[in-house]
Amino acid sequence: MTNIIELPEVLANQIAAGEVVERPASVVKELVENAIDAKSSQITVEIEESGLKMIQVTDNGEGMSHEDLPLSLRRHATSKIKSQSDLFRIRTLGFRGEALPSVASISKITIKTATKEVTHGSLLIATGGEIETLEAISTPTGTKIKVENLFYNTPARLKYMKSLQAELAHIVDVVNRLSLAHPEVAFTLISDGRQLTQTSGTGDLRQAIAGIYGLNTTKKMLAISNADLDFEVSGYVSLPELTRANRNYMTILVNGRYIKNFLLNRAILDGYGSKLMVGRFPIVVIDIQIDPYLADVNVHPTKQEVRISKERELMALISTAISESLKEQDLIPDALENLAKSSTRHFSKPEQTQLPLQSRGLYYDPQKNDFFVKESAVSEKIPETDFYFGAVDNSVKVEKAELLPHSEEVIGPSSVKHASRPQNTFTETDHPNLDLKNRQKLSQMLNRLENEEKSVFPELDYFGQMHGTYLFAQGKDGLFIIDQHAAQERVKYEYYRDKIGEADSSLQQLLVPYLFEFSGSDFINLQEKMALLNEVGIFLEVYGHNTFILREHPIWMKEEEIASGVYEMCDMLLLTNEVSIKTYRAELAIMMSCKRSIKANHSLDDYSARNLLLQLAQCQNPYNCPHGRPVLINFSKADMEKMFRRIQENHTSLRELGKY
């Protein structure tokens, strides 16, 4: 008796489903890709309970004939390739003939389909891969596939499902990527009767980006284009000031297929060069058109891994396209042009820490307990509405009516403020070892900060500043040199650490609420983790499509910091994922103290410098910034006398030291 047997087809399909169908989002991906291959122009995805209860994909594509319908549930049955040579010139998204049989083997599936050549359509119902019903019905041209009770016969897979919100976020991300890959298709995503995503299907990639990431993001995107004999690269990349905390917003498309490729991601970052802050990543949508002979998509059942010939040449093409596009943007003239148009409330201009700046006075406000730049000229003022979009080139400005023709303004411009994400306010040179994603280093930092003891600070007499960076003071122990950024960072850290801890009861109503816009997946993830934000006094309410509204803010957060501060908190929450309230508050205090502190190349007047030293003296630990860098160094009188050789060692001591 032989020990080797051929597995039943249903069991083989269930095994294949383990590779193809990892979660409900995998089902959505496979069904939508089939609809795209069927040349659909409209695709509607409806889900219930994040796809575990029901997934329905409706398209207006070519449909299937009555004879082909049962064959679609047979493993390795496909209409997309017919010979071995076809495998090397694949232009469809699917070709393996595994998706539909795999999905059908672990669910109940209902398919209604019709082609335009016939007067009637077909209905197929199957459970666990076994066909129960196959009959003729009346149905529109196209295909409607309903998947119910997913994983009903594979409970082990259900056990590893995450929360409903997490699974829904994965589905939203899949639909968004496919929408970007195929802007010519109108996509609609509906979850439990609520519309989450809708694109117009006009074929305009910028319009698709606006529908997914929002109009504000689209205004900060630059077009790129490059080509050689083998590749055509096009798409949009964000300005260096518009970044995110992870790579999830970097979308690479090859012949209309979303792929993951580490080397191409690196090429994108190389194109930005030093313009990106460490640990930050741009928003990118790059479409690569390539000869199918140069790309092998038959690597993994999910077809997200692609081997590309001449990959180094493609990397250089992408990097060059991005760097050339950024080089063409003369950001300073554009910013000044927008500043001249200011007609609203003004904020202090954010400085650039790595460039030699013109000296400007920084003053101290004892009532607000904070520093400010004196607004003496129009060029030092930025309008609130242009703070985030001030550097956009005229060629990439997009009108709302142009991008979103079906959208309507719900509220007047004076009833709310549209919050803008903060620009990068500290650089790698400030804290080269700071990485909020490195949980081990961060934990060590937090433990050190928690165990700090009260220190005694010497009495200092301030007398000068050097290079707009270092303060000089004298005391009974000699000369002290203070790093002004590290000093105020320590002051701010202890302020935020204490104030954030009191956030539960100290809230102030906003006269004009703020609106905060996120991508679909981030919007869903934030809803799931909203309790963490509530713990620190941030109460966001759902307000329209992928938008939250903030009606009150914690007292510890200054009014001018609301927009950037809330975005920073949300980014950290998305980045750190699950985190205790205590750790979250400490991380938040560290981050906000760094971003809110004065930087190098910024001159202080005497009064402001003395007040900074006074605040530093009141800190629990005035000697180190939260990241461990020294705040000040000391040269004693004896040290100074040795440097000027007023004190010299005798010959005996020098011989003892081995110098003679």
UniProtKB/Swiss-Prot annotation:
This is DNA mismatch repair protein MutL. Pfam families: DNA_mis_repair, HATPase_c_3, MutL_C. InterPro entries: DNA_mismatch_repair_CS, DNA_mismatch_repair_MutL, DNA_mismatch_S5_2-like, HATPase_C_sf, MutL/Mlh/PMS, MutL/Mlh/Pms-like, MutL_C, MutL_C_dimsub. One of its GO terms (molecular function) is ATP hydrolysis activity. Residues 414-433 are annotated as: Disordered. Coiled coil: none annotated. Belongs to the DNA mismatch repair MutL/HexB family. PROSITE patterns: DNA_MISMATCH_REPAIR_1 (PS00058). It comes from Streptococcus pyogenes serotype M5 (strain Manfredo). This protein is involved in the repair of mismatches in DNA. It is required for dam-dependent methyl-directed DNA mismatch repair. May act as a 'molecular matchmaker', a protein that promotes the formation of a stable complex between two or more DNA-binding proteins in an ATP-dependent manner without itself being part of a final effector complex. CDD domains: HATPase_MutL-MLH-PMS-like (cd16926), MutL_Trans (cd00782). GO terms for cellular component: mismatch repair complex. The keyword DNA repair applies. One of its GO terms (biological process) is mismatch repair. Keywords: DNA damage, DNA repair.
